[in-house]
């Protein structure tokens, strides 16, 4: 039995030697572990990792200190849009009465200058024959020829009326203006509801006339009156163009 065991061991050893020769490596059984080595040097820093999720908010900090001083005023801004107009206020109290006009030397001086200028203007117009004074009336013309309604409106805008003689003196003054312009002129008269009855434009009946012989004879168809260059009157329709003479 012992012999058999020795034989088997010998065969195993021979086989093991042949295996070493063939592979040039001999496989032995693991040895006893050695002692641990010393710590090596620290490795290099690794690359930055991926950005992580935000963390939760931290707790509220303590209150700050006292507020600082106010800053300086800024630059003035651009003006805004105008606002809506407010309601009209109540009238104020009535002031004390002023001084009478005759006590105001400056006003009196101004009025005196105005009167002087008016008199000068009247003198120039009188010399030109475009204005004549008779009593408290002034007769004037601008030389235009218009129909009756247009003359009436023209004189009203100037603050007067169509010339209407109420005396021989006034009729003569109007006649002299007509002669100067060598034309006829309308008078401030109009026929009433009854043919042949004429009135002043204020509705008063005519108290002075100087009709041409046989006039008026329009029989209600000629409502206006014209004056000839000899001062006599004739009834006429109101659409003709005649010299505009106003009285003031």
Swiss-Prot record:
The entry annotates sugar attachment on: 207
* Keywords (A to Z) from UniProt: Calcium, Collagen, Disulfide bond, Extracellular matrix, Gaseous exchange, Glycoprotein, Lectin, Metal-binding, Secreted, Signal, Surface film
Against Pfam families, the record matches this protein to: Lectin_C (PF00059)
List the InterPro entries hit by this protein, alphabetically: C-type_lectin-like (IPR001304), C-type_lectin-like/link_sf (IPR016186), C-type_lectin_CS (IPR018378), Ca-dependent_lectin (IPR051077), Collectin_CTLD (IPR033990), CTDL_fold (IPR016187)
The family database entries (CDD domains) matched by this protein are listed as:
CLECT_collectin_like
Share an example GO biological-process annotation for this protein: respiratory gaseous exchange by respiratory system
Q: Where in the cell is it found?
A: Secreted; Secreted, Extracellular space, Extracellular matrix; Secreted, Extracellular space, Surface film
Q: Where is the Collagen-like domain?
A: 28-100
TM region positions: none
A GO CC annotation recorded here is: collagen trimer
Boundaries of each C-type lectin domain copy?
127-247
Compositionally biased region (Low complexity): 69-82
Here the segments flagged for biased composition (Basic and acidic residues) are 42-51, 84-93
Task: Enumerate the residue ranges of region (Disordered).
Answer: 29-103
Disulfide-bond pairs as recorded: 155-246, 224-238
Q: Which residues form the signal peptide?
A: 1-17
What is its biological role? In presence of calcium ions, it binds to surfactant phospholipids and contributes to lower the surface tension at the air-liquid interface in the alveoli of the mammalian lung and is essential for normal respiration. Enhances the expression of MYO18A/SP-R210 on alveolar macrophages.
The protein's assembly and partners = Oligomeric complex of 6 set of homotrimers.
Protein name per its UniProtKB record:
Pulmonary surfactant-associated protein A
Q: Which organism is it from?
A: Ovis aries
């Amino acid at each position: 039995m012992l012999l058999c065991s020795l034989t088997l061991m010998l065969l195993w050893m021979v086989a093991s030697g042949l295996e070493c020769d063939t592979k040039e490596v001999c496989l032995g059984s693991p040895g006893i572990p050695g002692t641990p080595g010393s710590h090596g040097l620290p490795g290099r820093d690794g690359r930055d990792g991926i950005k992580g999720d935000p963390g939760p908010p931290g707790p509220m900090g303590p209150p700050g200190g006292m507020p600082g001083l106010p800053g300086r005023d800024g630059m003035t801004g651009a003006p805004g849009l105008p606002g809506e107009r407010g309601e009209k206020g109540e009238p104020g109290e009535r002031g004390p009465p002023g001084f009478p006009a005759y006590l105001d030397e400056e006003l009196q001086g101004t009025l005196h200058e105005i009167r002087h200028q008016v008199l000068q203007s009247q003198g120039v117009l009188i010399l030109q024959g475009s204005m004549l004074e008779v009593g408290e009336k002034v007769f004037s013309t601008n030389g235009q020829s218009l129909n009756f309604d247009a003359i009436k409106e023209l004189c009203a805008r100037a603050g007067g009326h169509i010339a209407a003689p109420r005396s021989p003196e006034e009729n003569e003054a109007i006649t002299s203006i007509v002669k100067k312009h060598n034309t006829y002129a309308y008078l401030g008269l109009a026929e009433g509801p009854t043919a042949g009855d004429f009135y002043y434009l204020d509705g008063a009946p005519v108290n002075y006339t100087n009709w041409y012989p046989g006039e008026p004879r329009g029989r209600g168809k000629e409502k206006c009156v014209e004056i000839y260059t000899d001062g006599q009157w004739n009834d006429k329709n109101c659409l003709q163009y005649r010299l505009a003479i106003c009285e003031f």
